[in-house]
């Protein structure tokens, strides 16, 4: 009882004193010092107080003091509710399940058969057991050194029976118990746990723990400190968690058996408690390389004797020995069999973190699935053969576990030995230990280690298998065995050749073409005269990431092969114009005869013939007007005379050339460079594209490149607009509010039956008035108040007017312009071509015709609808499906947009191209000038030329638009969120017949479809802007329809 109190006081008092030091009162708290002192004094007395209880086998202590108890019995009642029954030491044997405190005899047997009388004591009762130890003289292949807690003494030559008192610890002695210090450790080995018994789940946090049974009760482990073994070798049954492996001293080793082996190979033990042990002959041991026999033991039922315990300990050791070889995280000592693993000289790392290592030592020990990461100048290791380690290896004892299947492996041939008399067993074990240590000791590398030279060294660098994809060209993966560790692969980068020179070559290759694929070769890079990519270089697989104002092009070079430049469109346009200005004049010797496909501008991609039967063409046009050239093109063919009614396609008298001509213009060549833009590039005018016919390219070339301005024509007197007008509620819908206009009767061709009524009654609109073709159900009733008398005019004069004011567009310039016509070959509305199978227009243009079930046709690539044969490349296609926006309001014209899917695909050729769609939600700044095109009226009263014209108008902010429109109407005008305003300049505006047509804004040199003509109050009135559909508000709706149809 006093011992319990002193123990608790020894542990708790330092804690209390530390609390006192921390909570030492300041001078301002002097008045509370006595209170604190009395409180702590009472707390100390309470914690250190103990009490006895008849039911408690130990002593009742305070709950806080149970931390030092070996076991706490919660079901035992104590005098105070705050107390628990505490058992300080391990109970000394409770029936068969109690932990046994055994008596360990020190016995040395001789070659003769002897009978030793032993006194064996158990904890519960002391009984005498007579044990007969039979020692056979059969020689063993290799006597296995054993370390048993009953350590033997080598000084005894006679049969000695010694009874030791029960010890509290079992400590393994060293392998050479000759001096007095070794004998003292052998005595300490008979004690129980020298550390602290902790639960199994906490044992992994110990610096080390012993795995032998009997040290602690079931479910606990003996947790010890490595400092206890700082001057000696580690016992066999010690287990060191991986995180504490670094705490080992270099001179500490873990031996399998530290005591000399007994010379007895077979022992049969008989006890009075019917404990029987049978011996299995040595030849029957197939799966165990240990020379010990496998013992099958029937446990006693009631009492446990010393002999039974000793056998159990021996079998436990055998179990551990059988478990050791399959474990991958074990370090074998020089005295054992199996693979020799060295200690990791770097750091053990797990999983993907191993990729950051300079090298991975596969022969070094790391726990679990971790790898030994060697950084810096660590020596390279060959996985096939390793030299013996320079310091003793460390054996990592395994945890007790079920016996796994052990593969049969023949042990190394030991020297044959026989049992000698007296200390022969000890002498034999010493010889074996010396021989094994000699074999495993460091020595100069003999000639056989020359074998690793056969494994070729990795010519590049080693990568983990999961990182093999990062071995990129021109590096290659080496499939043959190399010096790379297991789980790694060699990436050979020696074949990459010298790095690519950064300096430009002095003499460019004359055969280099700027439009060819990249020229980077593995070893001998060809000179590339192209400029560096001003954008980003990406692989073609990621070309979809190059969008909006950027485009994939071969005009610029990339540093790495297989990549293409994604450059801004403005840079591409500048480069293209620069190349065009550097083209020299094309001087044909005689004017060539009429030719088929155009040859003046060969496309960058494989050439396409856009005109199967082209009309006769004049000589090739003058390519560079800034070069003096007496050659003048002759008058064009009659088919193109109507496009240039004044003076043909000739230029005005020699405009002033720009003075920024590069020096290279002095060279001449007969092969002009092609334009960069192919037919698939959106937002590029038809005058800047490849494959454009020579006759159409002449005027547009000079206008687009050298600033030759067109003559603008203002609204004629027919539009008679006076700014002094009264407010009204009129609203002009710029599409369905016009009468369908008859166009030439060959536009539909074979799309309608020749015997049908509409085909037989087609009439030229030159001799008829609009009223003759006006249906009754075309417009809402409140729109019919406007008199469309402008259609009575005669169009034989071919006045160039369309949108109010503006100017003529060139033939094929606005190549995304589309005309909607009905089955009677009558023009309805404008539209824009956004895909080879998709057309975007205003919803009010098609709602009535869709209700009637009539067919709709589109005309693409036709500059002049009044001509009999149309423009080169023009096509007519039938609309297969009409998608009107689900929220379209025909009264307020909100969401006035429709998507038309064509039956078949439009061929992108001369005069036919696509317009770019804007990004979702993009709005253009107020004041930005954009271009509206269409076939419609020249003024509010007409006439309509049905020829593509353009007008440049400014974007108007929403607030200004609402203010200006409300100033001319009696009704309150509310601008829908999906619409915007543009225009408001007198004489320049869209008008009737332009509905659904495109309003395009230039962004980085490319045109985006900013809006569709919807409606407005009059045409070309000052400060009265028109309303347009905001295309960017419907990008999601458009993409959804197109993606569903493309499935």
Swiss-Prot record:
Proteolytically cleaved and thereafter secreted. Glycans are attached at residues 95, 251, 287, 582, 726, 794. Residues 1-30 form the signal peptide. Residues 192-224 are annotated as: CLIP 2. Residues 98-139, 148-175, 263-280, 662-672 have a biased composition (Low complexity). Residues 501-527, 588-606, 613-638, 650-661 have a biased composition (Pro residues). InterPro entries: CLIP_SPH_mas, Peptidase_S1_PA, Peptidase_S1_PA_chymotrypsin, Peptidase_S1A, Trypsin_dom, TRYPSIN_HIS. Disulfide bonds join 56-85, 60-78, 69-86, 193-222, 197-216, 206-223, 344-372, 348-366, 357-373, 458-490, 462-484, 471-491, 533-565, 537-558, 546-566, 682-916, 829-845, 930-1001, 961-981, 991-1019. The CLIP domain consists of 37-55 residues which are 'knitted' together usually by 3 conserved disulfide bonds forming a clip-like compact structure. This is Protein masquerade.
């Amino acid at each position: 009882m006093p011992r319990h109190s002193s123990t608790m006081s020894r542990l708790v008092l330092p804690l209390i004193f530390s609390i006192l030091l921390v909570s030492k009162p300041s001078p301002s708290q002097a008045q509370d010092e006595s209170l604190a002192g009395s409180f702590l004094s009472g707390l100390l007395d309470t914690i250190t107080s103990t009490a006895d209880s008849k039911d408690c086998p130990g002593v009742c202590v305070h709950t806080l003091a149970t931390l030092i108890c070996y076991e706490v019995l919660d079901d035992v009642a104590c005098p105070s509710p705050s107390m628990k029954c505490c058992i300080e030491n391990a109970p000394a044997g409770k029936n068969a399940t109690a932990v046994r405190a055994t008596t360990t005899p020190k016995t040395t047997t001789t070659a003769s058969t002897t009978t030793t009388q032993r006194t064996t004591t158990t904890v519960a009762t002391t009984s005498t057991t007579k044990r007969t130890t039979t020692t056979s003289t059969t020689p063993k292949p290799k006597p296995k050194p054993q370390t048993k807690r009953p350590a033997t003494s080598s000084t005894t030559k006679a049969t000695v029976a010694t009874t030791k008192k029960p010890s509290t610890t079992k400590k393994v002695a060293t392998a050479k118990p000759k001096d007095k210090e070794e004998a003292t450790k052998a005595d300490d080995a008979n004690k129980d746990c020298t550390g602290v018994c902790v639960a199994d789940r906490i044992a992994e946090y110990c610096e080390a723990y012993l795995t032998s049974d009997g040290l602690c009760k079931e479910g606990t482990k003996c947790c010890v400190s490595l400092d206890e073994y700082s001057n000696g070798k580690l016992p066999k049954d010690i287990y060191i968690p991986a995180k504490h492996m670094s705490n080992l001293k270099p001179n500490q080793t873990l031996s399998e058996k530290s005591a000399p082996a007994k010379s007895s190979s077979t022992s049969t033990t008989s006890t009075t408690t019917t404990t029987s042990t049978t011996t299995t002959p040595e030849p029957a041991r197939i799966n165990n390389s240990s020379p010990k026999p496998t013992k099958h033991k029937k446990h006693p039922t009631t009492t446990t004797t010393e002999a039974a315990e000793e056998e159990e300990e021996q079998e436990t050791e055998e179990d551990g020995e059988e478990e050791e070889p399959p474990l991958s995280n074990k370090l074998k000592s020089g005295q054992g069999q199996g693979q020799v693993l060295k200690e990791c000289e770097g750091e053990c790392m797990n999983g993907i973190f191993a990729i950051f290592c300079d090298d991975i030592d596969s022969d070094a020990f790391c726990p679990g699935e971790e790898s030994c990461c060697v950084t810096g100048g660590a020596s390279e290791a060959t996985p096939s053969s390793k030299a013996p380690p320079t310091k003793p290896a460390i054996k990592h004892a395994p945890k007790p576990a079920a016996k796994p299947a052990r593969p049969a492996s023949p042990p190394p041939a030991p020297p044959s030995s026989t049992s000698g008399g007296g200390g022969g067993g000890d002498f034999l074990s010493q010889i074996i230990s010396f021989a094994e240590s000699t074999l495993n000791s460091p020595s100069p590398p003999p000639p056989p280690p020359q074998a690793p030279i056969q494994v070729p060294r990795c010519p590049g660098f080693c990568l983990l298998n999961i990182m093999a994809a990062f071995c990129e060209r021109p590096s290659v993966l080496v499939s043959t065995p190399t010096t790379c560790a297991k789980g790694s692969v060699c990436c050979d980068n020696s074949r990459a050749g010298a790095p690519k020179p950064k300096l430009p070559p002095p003499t460019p290759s004359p055969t280099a073409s700027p439009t060819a694929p990249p020229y980077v070769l593995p070893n001998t890079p060809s000179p590339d005269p192209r400029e560096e990519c001003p954008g980003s270089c990406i692989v073609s697989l990621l070309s979809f990431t190059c969008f909006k104002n950027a485009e994939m092009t071969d005009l610029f070079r990339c540093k790495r092969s297989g990549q293409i430049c994604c450059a801004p469109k403005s840079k591409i346009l500048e480069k293209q114009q620069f190349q065009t200005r550097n083209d020299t004049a094309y001087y044909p010797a005689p004017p060539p005869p009429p030719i088929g496909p155009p040859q003046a501008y060969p496309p960058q991609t494989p050439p396409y013939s856009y005109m199967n039967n082209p009309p006769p063409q004049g000589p090739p046009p003058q390519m560079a007007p800034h070069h003096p050239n007496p050659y003048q093109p002759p008058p064009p063919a009659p088919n193109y005379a109507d496009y240039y009614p004044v003076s043909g396609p000739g230029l005005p008298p020699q405009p002033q050339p720009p003075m920024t001509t590069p020096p290279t213009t002095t060279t001449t060549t007969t092969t002009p460079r092609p334009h960069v833009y192919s037919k698939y590039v959106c937002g590029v005018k038809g005058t800047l594209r490849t494959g454009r016919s020579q006759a159409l390219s002449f005027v547009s070339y000079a206008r687009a490149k050298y600033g030759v301005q067109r003559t603008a024509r203002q609204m004629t007197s027919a539009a008679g607009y006076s700014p002094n007008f009264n407010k009204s509620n009129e609203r002009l819908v710029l599409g369905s509010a016009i009468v369908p206009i008859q166009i030439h009767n060959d536009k539909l061709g074979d799309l309608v039956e020749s015997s049908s009524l509409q085909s037989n009654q087609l009439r030229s609109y030159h001799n008829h008035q609009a009223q003759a073709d006006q249906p009754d159900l075309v417009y809402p009733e409140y729109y019919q108040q406007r008199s469309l008398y402008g259609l009575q005019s005669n169009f034989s004069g071919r006045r160039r007017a369309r949108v109010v004011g503006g100017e003529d567009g060139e033939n094929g310039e606005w190549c995304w312009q589309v005309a909607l016509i009905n089955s009677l070959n009558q023009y309805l509305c404008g539209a824009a071509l956004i895909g080879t199978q998709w057309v975007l227009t205003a919803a009010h243009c098609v709602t009535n015709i869709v209700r009637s079930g009539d067919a709709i046709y589109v005309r693409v690539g036709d500059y002049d609808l009044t001509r009999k044969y149309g423009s080169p490349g023009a096509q007519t296609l039938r609309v297969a499906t009409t998608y009107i926006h689900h929220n379209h309001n025909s009264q307020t014209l909100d969401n006035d947009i429709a998507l038309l899917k064509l039956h078949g695909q439009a061929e992108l050729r001369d005069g036919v191209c696509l317009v770019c769609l804007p990004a979702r939600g993009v709005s253009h700044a107020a004041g930005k000038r954009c271009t509206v095109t269409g076939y419609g009226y020249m003024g509010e009263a007409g006439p309509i030329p049905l020829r593509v014209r353009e007008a440049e108008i400014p974007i108007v902010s929403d607030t200004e638009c609402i203010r200006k429109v409300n100033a001319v109407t009696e009704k309150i005008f509310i601008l829908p969120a999906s619409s915007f305003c543009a225009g408001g300049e007198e004489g320049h505006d869209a008008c009737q017949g332009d509905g659904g047509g495109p309003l395009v804004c230039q962004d980085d040199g490319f045109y985006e479809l900013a809006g569709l003509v919807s409606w407005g109050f009059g045409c070309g009135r000052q400060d009265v802007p028109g309303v347009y559909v905001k295309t960017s508000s419907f990008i999601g709706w458009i993409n959804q329809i197109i993606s569903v149809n493309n499935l």
